[in-house]
Amino acid sequence: MKTYSATPKDIDRRWYVVDAEGMVLGRLASEVAKIIRGKHKPMYTPHMDTGDFVIVINASKVQVTGRKAEQKTYFSHTGYMGHEKHTPFASVLAKHPERVIEKAVYGMLPKTALGRQVLRRKLRVFAGAEHPHIAQSPAALTFSSAEAK
């Protein structure tokens, strides 16, 4: 028996919409990362992009557990000595809620060209409940493991 390797003509791409309202950030990000990478499909091939498109709505209403809302920070560095920037989670969520989910999903993807390509092409995040991808007729997805308890 030979090992199956997907070819571009075999891949059937679908669109999904996920409502992030009341969901835990990390659990939601791990499920979304699986879908945009294609690991939920039996034809998953590590060296190819077999994933589906995911639209995340209500990004501004995502939740974190524990005291992460006050304690979590995002780190960046300008390249100059002493120019570290630590941005609190609450301020990023208030100004750019899309970036919170994008950064969480990026952290769960491989740091390769394929991982960056999958994130850039397959993930669409919106702060509110509206999105412009109605024409793709996305199917609604729910994750019971990501819901806040």
Swiss-Prot record:
Instruction: Give the UniProt keywords, A-Z.
Output: Ribonucleoprotein, Ribosomal protein
Q: Name one Pfam family in it.
A: Ribosomal_L13
Give the top-rank taxon of the lineage listed in the UniProt record for this protein. Bacteria
Q: Which GO terms describe its biological process?
A: negative regulation of translation; translation
State its role. This protein is one of the early assembly proteins of the 50S ribosomal subunit, although it is not seen to bind rRNA by itself. It is important during the early stages of 50S assembly.
Q: What's this protein's family per the entry?
A: Belongs to the universal ribosomal protein uL13 family.
Listed name of the protein:
Large ribosomal subunit protein uL13
